[in-house]
């Protein structure tokens, strides 16, 4: 019986989409990196979709930033306000700068598929990352539907895109 447990668990994880690795591209939209021609596109990896996992990002100077991310708690019915209390940084303005005024409150805040991380670099740079997936698309396996934003301690703001499928 035990020899069948591992394949069954692996298949269940694959079918449910609860485990995977995605490559993320960080496009600078504001800050010092946008002054470079062409602006560098940073590449990172995120693991284990929206349950919790790790993030790794290599900055333009070669600095490696690593961190752990987890779901952002949904606000309780008694809480009021326009930002989540579960994040290290208030990223609502970053969402609105990239996706348009009111996007954060209308789409991201309170979403079931909303996660945040702080990645710390080997030279001390901090990168605050948030990702969100529209609930109407939450059961698909194509990572391109996920939206994300980031800002770093050097004054850069990034739009994050995912262009591949989550895989084991």
Residue ranges and their predicted role:
Residues 155-168:
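Short, low-complexity, Pro/Ser/Thr/Gly-rich segments in the mature regions of secreted, periplasmic
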Residues 45-53, 72-85, 134-146, 167-168:
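Short, surface-exposed linear segments at secondary-structure transitions and domain or protein termini
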Residues 14-34:
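Bacterial Sec signal peptide processing site at the extreme N-terminus
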Residues 1-18:
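Sec-dependent bacterial lipoprotein signal peptides
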Residues 103-158:
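Acidic, glycine-rich flexible loop segments
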Residues 74-114:
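Mixed-charge, low-complexity intrinsically disordered segments
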Residues 35-73:
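Post-signal-peptide N-terminal segment of Sec-exported extracytoplasmic proteins
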């Amino acid at each position: 019986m035990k020899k069948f447990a591992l394949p069954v668990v692996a298949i269940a994880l694959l079918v449910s989409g609860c485990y995977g690795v995605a490559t993320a591209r960080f496009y600078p939209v504001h800050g010092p990196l946008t002054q470079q021609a062409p602006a560098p596109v940073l590449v990172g990896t995120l693991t284990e979709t929206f349950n919790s996992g790790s993030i790794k990002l290599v900055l333009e100077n070669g600095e490696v930033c690593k961190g752990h991310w987890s779901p952002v708690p949904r606000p309780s019915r008694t809480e009021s306000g326009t930002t989540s209390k579960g994040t290290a940084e208030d990223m609502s303005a970053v969402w609105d700068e990239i996706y348009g005024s009111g996007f954060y409150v209308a789409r991201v805040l309170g979403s079931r598929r909303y996660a945040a991380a702080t990645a710390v670099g080997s030279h001390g740079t901090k990168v605050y990352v948030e990702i969100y997936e529209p609930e109407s698309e939450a059961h698909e396996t194509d990572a391109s539907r996920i939206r994300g934003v980031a800002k770093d301690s050097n004054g850069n703001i990034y739009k994050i895109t995912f262009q591949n499928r989550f895989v084991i």
